[in-house]
């Protein structure tokens, strides 16, 4: 099960459709509850296997720390700019159970280039 969210700006949603299609065809299902922090806590406790999205730091940092401390693998699908702490960089987050991180990253990156 994979959690994600979508931008408030509708014009930004279309570019995310290839990722969503890849997840819907390559994973069990998608969940969206509207809270990045809660989605990350769901990864931390095992209700979700993965979460990906770009959000504001205040939307994800607490859940990121909880997930990381619970043993989740946390990272980004793109390079974090120099001088920006990875824990605060809000773009292209990927947080998963340790066993699925590489496969999920590959799936999402391949969708970006499809």
Task: Annotate each predicted stretch with a short phrase.
Residues 1-114:
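An extended, acidic
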